[in-house]
Amino acid sequence: RLPYRTNSLVVNLLQNRILNITEEFRRGTFTQRCSQLSFGILCLFLLECSITGGGRYWEAGPVSVRILLGGLAAVLALPELFRHLGAYLKKPAVWLTLAFVAWLAFCAWRGVRAENRMDVLLTDIKGFMWLFLVPVLVATVRSRQRLRVLLSWVLAGAVIQAALILAVNAAVVLMDDPAPLCRWLNEHTVGIVDVVSARLVRVFFKSSPYMIVGCVVALFRQARAPKLRWRYVLAVALLFNALLLSYTRSLYGALGLTALVSIVAVLVLCPEGRKRTLAFLLAAVVCFGVLVTVQEFALEGSYLSFAVSRTIGKEVPTSWASQLRSQLRGEDPGDSPDDGEMDSQRSYIEVTEKSDQLRQETKDSLNVYIQRSPIIGCGLGASAANRDKGVDEYFYLDMLARTGVVGLLLYMLPFGYVVVWCLRRRELLRECPEGAAVVCGLCTFWIVTWFNPWMNAVLGIAWYAVTLSVPQALEEQNA
């Protein structure tokens, strides 16, 4: 009788648990628990996005840590979504996203019918599948407190990424054989590590835009602080340094334009903190200069001058830190380092020029598709002929070629809605400037995605989803 009694106990236990869950669901406590768990996993998800690039450092078949976290967050958000499904479907951020998804399905059908590249078509679909994060975040980030917590995780991830970039830079310069480290980072899509010369290394993590987002979050938080917060100053200086080591023109441009938009927004929303904001910016730039100078002395690389050289495509004199180092060592403080070092840098700049030529060919090829069907596009899978792997890089031209003007406008409409909402509800943004920080942070992705396809992949779409949750988070607090 013992097995029978044991089975009865198990059955009774399961029945009681099911009844408890049903009662909790009826009262809303079960939904609340799931929402809390979903939010916690989303924090880990965005932390991971802001550090590890492609997120392929650990995989079990097709499943990576990022896919696992995103899937769990979505499943746990389902009770909240189903409980108030009608209300969420009326949210402009949700139904505008669904309208774009419907158009995307139409473009996929057109791509199949036109016999476009099937591998590229599937890649397009996989990238935009992350749009499921929009309803998940809208349903989960339902208060200002949760929005602030989420941004704290993103800021922490951005600072960790910056520290890793500086560590990788120093390790590659100092190691006798840095090839295994570079190969591991490249193969696991964390980022690109190119050895420019014996003293210069280009370290570009695919999560780099999140470092600009981190700068924006720190700026807005400092604006509301009663005094200068040195932890934010040092964090921004570290982020600036890591962005410098990327030697990536699109990131430099995005940093400049995002800084302009963010500073204007801060001065408008937080007028009482203008002096502290200006002092914060000055202190961050000074700390950044000190940090770069120390690195140039220690690692003997002329980072600033090479960054300018790669940006403008012309050789410039070495930075003052490198010249001062030469003087202190009794060396010839000329405007150039040794010939071998400069030859390596010139060769890398020539590679950049060849890359620009390939980019121009890509644009010309995509323009052929755009001219063929500018309104509705040529369907998913349409790809530049000169790109064997189908990776075209130019997001806006990709969208116009594959989904047309209609598709691009539908994709950007939710962002337009949030911008209009922010302009109309400025009083809520003054109470919670972090909402404006999220929107300014998304400007970074809209800028850098001109050169790299961030906005049709998880890193850009994840932040897009955070942005679309801002009205819900700020209005819910006011309800």
Residue ranges and their predicted role:
Residues 1-108, 112, 145, 152, ...:
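Transmembrane signal-anchor hairpin modules in multi-pass inner-membrane enzymes, especially those
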Residues 94-102, 116-140, 149-158, 162:
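Aromatic-anchored transmembrane helix interface
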Residues 148-182, 198-270, 417:
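Alpha-helical transmembrane segments of multi-pass inner-membrane proteins
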Residues 259-260, 437-479:
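Transmembrane alpha-helices of multi-pass inner-membrane enzymes
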Residues 266-350, 368-372:
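A membrane-periplasm/extracellular boundary helix in multi-pass inner-membrane enzymes
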Residues 336-405:
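Long extracytoplasmic/lumenal interhelical loops at the membrane interface
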Residues 403-446:
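Hydrophobic transmembrane alpha-helices and their immediate junctions
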